């Protein structure tokens, strides 16, 4: 499937409504509908971008994939997703799927969406990492150059299928790599398995995202946050569905945060829909809220 997926799809500015970004869906269809209802999402005007991983783990992967085929009254697509690593792995397809139909939808997913925006030149959607065009620079150099205004935004804004040629392994890195995330974890000596996310709350993170908006998932975080030069928004929605092997991996974090996150691209406002039967969701100030599955909340802080 990897040979057929386009590398980059460019989309025009949304002149009618808002753009939103949703974290890794993993079949959490009902929670997505709750979020759309909460923000009064209008399919005739608004657009929703997913950072990938529509399927596996959650209860309604079929419904999530089928969103790719939905149109509004004008016949326009309103739901968009990039390719995630779980979307790429064919053998994860459920036996109940009508494989030809769903596989055909997944083979059309791009690795990257490049989207024009009225408030800033563009924003980007990618599943894991977008470092393929900066092969000779490490993450610290990228960060420093972004902060010091030495890295030209044009290197991002000029990307299209005509000037980027990638090998299969490089394409796989876009949906599988964790280098950027792990670099900053190691650099700050953070033990994320013990719930240490203090390294995320540095002021320079917000300075970076003011220059460059790259939304991604793949690495689970307790709330959407800027790490390095990317905005991570996978908040472990699927773990709320009592998958023992997966929940055990994050048990040290406590029963905190399993929810599906959605971001208003215009404002950086974060919304969440709880997937855990019972949970405590922590914001940056460690405010604690007791919620049950299906509850929707507005986070106290924006991410930019």
Regions found by a protein language model. Give the residues of each.
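Core catalytic region of metal-dependent phosphoesterases/phosphodiesterases
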Residues: 18, 22, 27-99
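Short catalytic/ligand-binding loop motif for oxyanion handling, primarily in non-cytosolic enzymes
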Residues: 58-59, 88-92, 126, 132-136, ...
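Active-site-proximal loop/helix segment associated with metal-binding centers of metalloenzymes
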Residues: 117-206, 240
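Extended active-site neighborhood of metal-dependent phosphoesterases/phosphodiesterases
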Residues: 91-120
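Beta-strand-turn-beta hairpins that frame and shape the catalytic cleft
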Residues: 13-20, 114-124, 227-228
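Acidic, His/Gly-rich catalytic cores of divalent-metal-dependent hydrolytic chemistry
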Residues: 191-304
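Active-site metal-binding loops of divalent metal-dependent hydrolases
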Residues: 23-25, 52-55, 85-87, 128-130, ...
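Acidic, histidine-bearing metal-coordination/catalytic regions of metal-dependent phosphoesterases
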Residues: 1-16
